[in-house]
């Protein structure tokens, strides 16, 4: 069975057992009345069952309802069908004030019907010939308004300065100021020139997201013809059907696939209603993507540390044990489905490098947009500053130093032999994003 954990807030007077049963029925075989065609099938075989309800400590009107869905309810290899069944209609149920899908347990038999990421972590490292450290990226800013040639120039400066990747922002598609084909051509030129100068393999996340699947595929085909290593997709606004199709194309044609989660906070940010990002992360691993944005913990975007580390493990690891202290409701066995690199991006700069290296580890992508392009000396020095800071943190960690305790000291030491890093540290020494997260663990989940 597929197991689901729902946070249920029923209307006053609706008992938890009745609300849980209603969720199970509405998201499987049930309707609002008895129908004569019920007698034409075996409902016991197909109906969802609420097998447990547990109150949320500290919330008098909330409880967690655990629901089991028989596998025969779902089309093989279709995230679209899975979500249409489990969350498609029940969230508008009048008997509930709020409903949130906290987690899913996907059984191995169903996982095996998905291709998953086009390539996975190890294949990506082998393609790029880069090991033993996080990968470095940068989102080109301003995200909108640049001409294709100026955009390509910014890409080149960042890549030659030491970054592994640059990136289209999520809303860069094919606008009047920069059509997609022109952008692809100038970015490919920048990649090849930077590779020739540095001797390293470089990439730019060319956003293939489009208004139709046909246009999306056309852009991916052109990227392959240019010989670039990676394309990008906005998987929530683009949709799971389009994403899975693109992932299959990328595997067949040797392209890596970067995934942006634009629109996720509309779905996952409120604690009492919607869907937790760990569910969206699991769905992406099944649908297919080699990278996905996962918050930063320390930057400008929402993300509590333990919760973030929980879904980062769900993206990368083969087996993740149940751990309520990190918000993981079920043990998840991925049965060797390739892993996804989490991407830390959003309001981060060189002073965050020790914390990011310690939190996310080697199998991650650290992306500094403003933290590269905002360098007072230009894009290439900004890239140099980030690369020096990363190499210093990785070396210090490998020497046994504590990045959490000695991080600032490690960065200051590196500043002595890198004027680019010293300038970056001076610019961003006062920047903080100290706001309490909205989505936090429940009291009974914390150790």
UniProtKB/Swiss-Prot annotation:
The superkingdom listed in its UniProt entry is Eukaryota
Recorded catalytic activity of this chain's protein: 2 (2R)-3-phosphoglycerate + 2 H(+) = D-ribulose 1,5-bisphosphate + CO2 + H2O; D-ribulose 1,5-bisphosphate + O2 = 2-phosphoglycolate + (2R)-3-phosphoglycerate + 2 H(+)
Alphabetical UniProt keywords? Calvin cycle, Carbon dioxide fixation, Chloroplast, Disulfide bond, Lyase, Magnesium, Metal-binding, Monooxygenase, Oxidoreductase, Photorespiration, Photosynthesis, Plastid
Q: Per the annotation, which location comes first and is thus the protein's main one? A: plastid
Q: Where in the cell is it found?
A: Plastid, Chloroplast
PROSITE patterns, A to Z: RUBISCO_LARGE (PS00157)
Marked site, Transition state stabilizer, at: 300
Keyword flag Magnesium: yes
The answer, when asked if Magnesium is one of the entry's keywords, is yes
The record describes its post-translational modification as:
The disulfide bond which can form in the large chain dimeric partners within the hexadecamer appears to be associated with oxidative stress and protein turnover.
CDD domains under this entry? RuBisCO_large_I
Name the Gene Ontology molecular function terms of this record: magnesium ion binding; monooxygenase activity; ribulose-bisphosphate carboxylase activity
Entry binding sites for substrate: 89, 139, 143, 261, 293, 345
SUPFAM superfamilies named among the record's database cross-references: RuBisCo, C-terminal domain (SSF51649), RuBisCO, large subunit, small (N-terminal) domain (SSF54966)
The main enzyme category here is lyase
The residues listed in the UniProt record as binding Mg(2+), with positions renumbered to this chain, are 167, 169-170
Q: How is the cofactor bound?
A: Binds 1 Mg(2+) ion per subunit.
Co-factor requirement: Mg(2+)
Subunit annotation:
Heterohexadecamer of 8 large chains and 8 small chains; disulfide-linked. The disulfide link is formed within the large subunit homodimers.
Its biological purpose is as follows: RuBisCO catalyzes two reactions: the carboxylation of D-ribulose 1,5-bisphosphate, the primary event in carbon dioxide fixation, as well as the oxidative fragmentation of the pentose substrate in the photorespiration process. Both reactions occur simultaneously and in competition at the same active site.
Q: Which family does it belong to?
A: Belongs to the RuBisCO large chain family. Type I subfamily.
Query: What further note is attached to this protein's record?
Result: The basic functional RuBisCO is composed of a large chain homodimer in a 'head-to-tail' conformation. In form I RuBisCO this homodimer is arranged in a barrel-like tetramer with the small subunits forming a tetrameric 'cap' on each end of the 'barrel'.
Its protein name is Ribulose bisphosphate carboxylase large chain
State the organism named in the record. Convolvulus tricolor
